[in-house]
Amino acid sequence: MVKKFTSKIKAAVFAAVVAATAIFGPAISSQAVTSVPYKWDNVVIGGGGGFMPGIVFNETEKDLIYARADIGGAYRWDPSTETWIPLLDHFQMDEYSYYGVESIATDPVDPNRVYIVAGMYTNDWLPNMGAILRSTDRGETWEKTILPFKMGGNMPGRSMGERLAIDPNDNRILYLGTRCGNGLWRSTDYGVTWSKVESFPNPGTYIYDPNFDYTKDIIGVVWVVFDKSSSTPGNPTKTIYVGVADKNESIYRSTDGGVTWKAVPGQPKGLLPHHGVLASNGMLYITYGDTCGPYDGNGKGQVWKFNTRTGEWIDITPIPYSSSDNRFCFAGLAVDRQNPDIIMVTSMNAWWPDEYIFRSTDGGATWKNIWEWGMYPERILHYEIDISAAPWLDWGTEKQLPEINPKLGWMIGDIEIDPFNSDRMMYVTGATIYGCDNLTDWDRGGKVKIEVKATGIEECAVLDLVSPPEGAPLVSAVGDLVGFVHDDLKVGPKKMHVPSYSSGTGIDYAELVPNFMALVAKADLYDVKKISFSYDGGRNWFQPPNEAPNSVGGGSVAVAADAKSVIWTPENASPAVTTDNGNSWKVCTNLGMGAVVASDRVNGKKFYAFYNGKFYISTDGGLTFTDTKAPQLPKSVNKIKAVPGKEGHVWLAAREGGLWRSTDGGYTFEKLSNVDTAHVVGFGKAAPGQDYMAIYITGKIDNVLGFFRSDDAGKTWVRINDDEHGYGAVDTAITGDPRVYGRVYIATNGRGIVYGEPASDEPVPTPPQVDKGLVGDLNGDNRINSTDLTLMKRYILKSIEDLPVEDDLWAADINGDGKINSTDYTYLKKYLLQAIPELPKK
């Protein structure tokens, strides 16, 4: 999985300054915004859903564990529930960069203290400088120190570390390894102020790839380790080791408390040090690799230990460097604090047939891998894996031996053994955190029981949301995970939409036929069609024979209210329309690349578009678009949304250009005067006594960032979040629930899907699901028999015009392709003859 591509695009969009138009149309008066109490939570996807580059155990307090996300903030482990608690949800849109956590340090002297190095990108995608976040109550509250440089929580090399370290003898002192040639920094006042360690000789030289903006910066100083035995409590530690991303000299040491530094003599060269751990026996263990990760692990790797007492370097690589089997970086590194000779290391993206997790109980003299070869293609596994907490982790696919599914993971940049419990281990992957509670069974010939250890972490980059008027309350399109049908907001879904996709980028449904949906996506395989259709609310999907012209996939999609046409706007291509579920396509007349398109939610013939500063309407199902000549429009638009039940009512979210509405199909627009910024707009069930749907936006009103609701068509607004619930980047999608007043769903870039409901003692009911009956039961008697086959035949031959059931298409479209024809008749006949065990559509 190519993780976080979507978040990089997000950052580029976020950084763009949208110029507000200087002349506005007739203003809609808005009163000063007030706040109403809401309760907020995640729509559970489960399993994490993203890359968590690091896990940090406190060395002096049991069960005090932190995890850091590359775009989703930081978490603390709750041992009473065995779930993770998010710690940075208070950051709003303007501080989205702080959800990129570069490093975490938990204080071994005062466990209440915890520090975070925050900052997502070192390039120009986001304006924020890096920051040190300081807490004296385990992350319940934070103070902030702005650094004079940027950090890169979502940059190459982010699983190396930890870059931030606390002196175990004098916890006033912290060291920070930086990027971009900024070197090593130090604080002597609990992280409040910082100064550069001018005597440190090497800020790093390694650059992943100088040809691209995302990869052109120096990776820098990547980890700091203190030798606690070199001093006494209350006095600064004298001996400090620092790892630098430099293939010539990468390990440095100070023996005078950081005053002077020298490269450690005799060290290996030609590789990068991913992690360094100093064991109680004086051995400094280090994992090395050709590259910094986390996406690739190409090349070779090594594992070394340095005897800090004798100065001897010992190569303990599990697979000899000269072997052709040594084809990946060694990244993750763990040492058992109960026994310094027990160490574990991981491969970085070996991929085939799976990752490698090595364990040694004799200081690296011998190793065991968590699997070994049997009679090819069989492998002998020393583990079992349980993904019941996030069943979608099987990716909906089956593997051929020697590969199996689910895999051990990928991007395993960190592995940790609990310092208080030698049986507990956790490691990171590109999609979740795995772990076990019986690690030492492996040493006795037993199997390690690996399971998902990411409950509470929701780290997806969510790209689109719909809440249809029937069926599941929510259906999503998700970066890297494609997307899901969310039947229960508090229980994670079992499967993703289309396993052959890599990311879902857009989704829509037909307002008058809400079971019909279209999904557009990215895919790594060339022959996969990057649009799919569903006739059962997203539970089953089929791909058409053809794609839109010049499509590379992705982009957005708009479905006609009557389901008779679909417009796909692929990434870097012009919008195109299909009226036959993708059998044929026609480029929409008068629109081009970059157009924003939406459908009217009443009239199936109408679509709307914003393109090159002009507003367009189509009245022929999307074939032809005409400039409405609407005056005084914003210069650009992020989202267009039309109002269900109100033909011609169109709203534009124009970021800094504000919020606009039209009631005549886009021929004229009005700008809401006191909505300063509107990133996205959506609609939900109308308030009691109102005939206009509730309107939801993320943006800024009266110079206050937040989420807002209007119950009176935009005349007045209330803020529905508070300063503790900002969730960072919330400019991708928002929708109210058409069945539950007050409920709103918001897509975030790194904190999954969040939803809010009015705070009250009475729970907001989840709408009952409509039982549409059995597929194949055409007469509604809850049985599938020869009577249904006869009805099917008569219907296909047009002897009858309608079937006895309420939803003909649901019951008779046996294979889910959106049509009722002889193919469905054949499937039903085979099923009744027991030639097939089940029908294709569930």
Curated annotation (Swiss-Prot):
| Dockerin domain span | 771-841
The BNR repeat ranges on this chain? 134-144, 185-196, 252-262, 358-368, 533-541, 577-586, 616-626, 660-671, 708-718
The enzyme's E.C. designation: 3.2.1.-
A GO-annotated cellular component:
cellulosome
Give one GO biological process term. xyloglucan catabolic process
Q: Does the keyword Repeat apply?
A: yes
- Gene3D superfamilies cross-referenced by the UniProt entry: Dockerin domain, YVTN repeat-like/Quinoprotein amine dehydrogenase
Instruction: Please name the top-level EC class of this enzyme.
Output: hydrolase
Enumerate the UniProt keywords alphabetically. Answer: Carbohydrate metabolism, Cellulose degradation, Glycosidase, Hydrolase, Polysaccharide degradation, Repeat, Signal
| Presence of the UniProt keyword Repressor in the record | no
Which pH dependence is annotated?
Optimum pH is 6.4 with tamarind seed xyloglucan as substrate. Retains 50% of its activity between pH 5.7 and 7.8.
Q: How does activity depend on temperature?
A: Optimum temperature is 75 degrees Celsius. Retains 25% of its activity after incubation at 90 degrees Celsius for 30 minutes.
Gene Ontology molecular function, alphabetical? xyloglucan-specific endo-beta-1,4-glucanase activity
Protein family: Belongs to the glycosyl hydrolase 74 family.
User: Which named protein is this?
Assistant: Xyloglucanase Xgh74A
